[in-house]
Amino acid sequence: MKRVFLFILTLGSLFMVPYAAMADETVTVTATSSDISENLDLKTVATLFGQAKDLEQFEALLNTPDSAFSNLDLNGDGEVDYLRVIETADDNRHLVVIQAVLAKDIYQDVASIFVEKDANNQVTVQVIGDEYIYGADYIIEPVYIYQPVIYDWFWGPSWV
C-alpha cells in the first residue's frame, strides 16, 4: 500500500512540474547603459499616454512584457520593476504619477504627467522625469496630432 501511495505521489508530482515552471516565469533585465534614465524613455511614455483610453490601459501598456521599452530595475533584483499609475485631480488639472514598485508597500516615483485644460478648452500635457533618475528639469511636452481619447476619460461624463 505504501508503494502504491508513493507511486501516485511521484506520478502526480511529475504532472505538476510544468505548471510550477510557468508560475515562476521571470523577466531578465539587461541594462542598456549605466544611466538608469535610459531604461525608461519618457517620449515613449508620452506616446503610450496618448494611445491609452484610460489610466488602467495606460498602466497595462507601460507593463507589457513583450515591449522592451521599460527596462527599469531600481531595486537591483534582476527583474523589471512593475510600474503603477496613480492619479489625483483638482478641477481642470490632473496629476498622473508613475511609480516603480520596489517591494511590498515601497514605491519610487519615476515620472509625473501634468494634464491641464485651460479656459479655452486647450489641453497641455507635460511629462516630467523624477529628478533623482532624470536630473533636473527633464520635461517633455508632447504634441498630439489627434486629441487623445484619455482626455475624454478625464473630462467626459461619468456615471456612478
Regions found by a protein language model. Give the residues of each.
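Bacterial N-terminal signal peptides that target proteins for export
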Residues: 1-8
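C-terminal segment of classical bacterial N-terminal signal peptides
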Residues: 14-21
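Boundary of Sec targeting at the N-terminus
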Residues: 23-25
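Extended, structured, electrostatic nucleic-acid-contact surfaces
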Residues: 64-70
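Acidic, glycine-anchored loop motifs typical of Ca2+
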Residues: 70-82
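Basic, polyanion-binding surface patches
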Residues: 94
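Low-complexity segments
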Residues: 99-160
